[in-house]
């Protein structure tokens, strides 16, 4: 700031205009260079930001979707807690020995009989799983 005053005083004393004009031009060049550097920096920040967004949207998202589409193993909802163990063997549940009760409780058709057998096997399997889970929790 004081350089201009000093240069103006020297110009008045010597009558030589070259020093003042040279300093004026050098400050304009400095300002232009500073503006160019600021514009370059802002451009790099913008380009980097857009490049990162494109990377996240196209490349990373594509990698995640490929992994999600092809699982390494088949997921089973049948036996969630016992994936590493085989399913327990289902033991048949014996009915009461009284024939009168057995006749009253007999299913009306073969389809009902198949359904009740499947349901009893499922219940026995579920009971077995619950017992195994409780035993594992106690250990």
From Swiss-Prot:
Source domain of life: Bacteria
Alphabetical UniProt keywords: Cell membrane, Membrane, Transmembrane, Transmembrane helix
Compartment list: Cell membrane
GO CC annotation terms, alphabetical: plasma membrane
Acidic residues biased stretches: 110-121
Membrane topology: Single-pass membrane protein
Primary site of residence: membrane
Function: Part of a cryptic operon that encodes proteins involved in type II secretion pathway in other organisms, but is not expressed in strain K12 under standard laboratory conditions. May play a regulatory role under conditions of derepressed gsp gene expression.
Entry protein name: Putative general secretion pathway protein B
Species of provenance: Escherichia coli (strain K12)
Gene: gspB
């Amino acid at each position: 700031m004081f350089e201009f005053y000093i240069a103006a005083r020297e110009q008045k004393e010597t009558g030589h205009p070259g020093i003042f004009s040279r300093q004026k031009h050098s400050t304009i060049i400095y300002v232009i260079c500073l503006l160019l550097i600021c514009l370059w920096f802002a451009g790099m920040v913008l380009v980097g930001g857009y490049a990162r967004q494109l990377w996240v949207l196209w490349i990373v998202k594509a990698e995640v979707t490929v992994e999600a589409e092809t699982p390494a193993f088949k997921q089973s909802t049948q036996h969630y807690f016992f994936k590493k163990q085989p399913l327990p063997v289902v033991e048949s549940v014996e009915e009461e020995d009284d024939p009168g009760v057995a006749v009253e409780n007999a299913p009306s058709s073969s389809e009902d009989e198949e359904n009740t057998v499947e349901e009893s096997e499922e219940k026995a399997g579920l009971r077995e799983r619950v017992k195994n889970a409780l035993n594992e929790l106690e250990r």
